[in-house]
UniProtKB/Swiss-Prot annotation:
One Pfam family cited in the UniProt record for this chain: IF-2B
HAMAP family: Salvage_MtnA
GO biological process: L-methionine salvage from methylthioadenosine
Protein name according to UniProt: Methylthioribose-1-phosphate isomerase
GO CC, alphabetical: cytoplasm; nucleus
Organism, as annotated: Drosophila pseudoobscura pseudoobscura (Fruit fly)
Length: 362
């Protein structure tokens, strides 16, 4: 059974504190928007899909017991809280898109004379809860599309009708801990395993926050997948020596041209994969694709505190007085990406804007 990082019933939300993993499994109550902002900003919950889900559900928990005098006052409350949640980690586009979707719903309901304030609140709660269910369904679809694409490429390269079990590499954490469940890039790995087509999965440590070593490795051991942890600096040697069939990573934001912002270190893995002729896939729901941003040059990159580089827990590991540069993400150019795996299929970066626009119109 997959790990459960988010526990929700109407009026109650708990998240698995990912800063304590893998040593301790502890759930934290999220009693409202302020708690939601803090757990997102402190990275106690992380992963673009999970950030959006937890942010929206924290608002649902906050307004659940409240009574509002008018639809206008409810709408104003929702707008202010949603904008605040978006500010917790601005690089991850999913929270912004979810906020825009919910605010659009609130605006429509405010204008609808057939809906009173109680019904408006109910409709809003229903919409936030539907996002939780949809994320899990979308992740399963991403897994199916991604596994199929990888196996087809491997079979074609071998001139065989069917691919055998494959070895894959992933970076950061994109599984049940980063989503509502199942995972994006790790969902592809999960689907390969379910098909009996996973020979081995390699995961990077993902410095400086060690999401790969702490979280992905934790999930892989939990699932009993054949898995090996490697240092970030070993990727070139790994691709040269271990016959890796594909790299599959997640995304925090994908620009209209296919440029992809993901956890720091993704860009260099893509460069190395290109050199070795290893297909490089990005797995992300449509909510991670921002067609309003023409290229990766326009993506705001969050910078994290020096302490995340200089300390492990309370122990300093870097020389006192050294300066640090600690961007949380980098941008992988579309030219290095083989395909972008979504819940609606796998798309080449050059076709992304046109294809997604058509999908959203249907």
């Amino acid at each position: 059974m997959s790990l459960q990082s988010i526990k929700y019933t109407r009026g109650s939300l708990e998240i698995l504190d990912q800063l304590l993993l893998p040593v301790q499994s502890k759930y934290l109550p999220v009693r409202g928007v302020e708690d939601g902002w803090k757990v997102i900003n402190k990275m106690q919950v992380r992963g673009a899909p999970a950030i959006a889900i937890v942010g929206c559900l924290s608002l649902a928990v906050e307004i659940h017991p409240e009574e509002f005098d008018s639809k206008k006052s409810l709408r104003q409350e929702l707008e202010g809280k949603l904008n605040y949640l978006v500010s917790a980690r601005p690089t991850a586009v999913n929270m912004k898109m979810a906020a825009d979707e919910l605010l659009s719903l609130a605006n429509d309901l405010t204008k609808d004379d057939n809906v009173d304030v109680a019904a408006m609140k109910q409709r809003f709660l229903n919409a936030t809860e539907a996002m939780l269910k949809k994320d899990i369904a979308d992740n399963r679809a991403i897994g199916a599309h991604g596994a199929k694409a990888i196996l087809q490429l491997v079979a074609a390269a071998a001139g065989a009708p069917m691919a055998g079990p494959v070895r894959v590499l992933t970076h950061c954490n994109t599984g049940s801990l980063a989503t509502a469940g199942y995972g994006t890039a790790l969902g592809v790995v999960r689907q390969l395993s379910e098909l009996g087509k996973l020979e081995h999965v390699y995961c990077t440590e993902t410095r400086p926050y060690n999401q790969g070593a702490r979280l992905t490795a934790y999930e892989l051991v939990h699932e009993k997948f054949p898995a090996t942890l490697v240092l970030d600096s070993m990727v070139a040697a790994l691709l040269r020596a271990k016959n890796v069939a594909a790299v599959v990573v997640g995304a925090d934001r994908v620009a209209a041209n296919g440029d992809t912002a993901n956890k720091i270190g993704t860009y260099q893995i893509a460069v190395v994969a290109k050199h070795h002729g290893v297909p490089f896939f990005v797995a992300a729901p449509l909510t991670s694709i921002d067609l309003h941003i023409p290229s990766g040059d326009h993506i705001i990159i969050e910078e994290r505190p020096d302490r995340e580089m200089t300390h492990v827990g309370e122990h300093r590991i870097a020389a006192p007085g050294i300066n640090c540069w600690n961007p949380a993400f980098d941008v992988t150019p579309a030219s290095l990406i083989t395909g972008i795996i979504t819940e609606r299929g796998v798309f080449q970066p050059a076709q992304l804007k046109e294809t997604i626009t058509k999908l959203l119109e249907t």
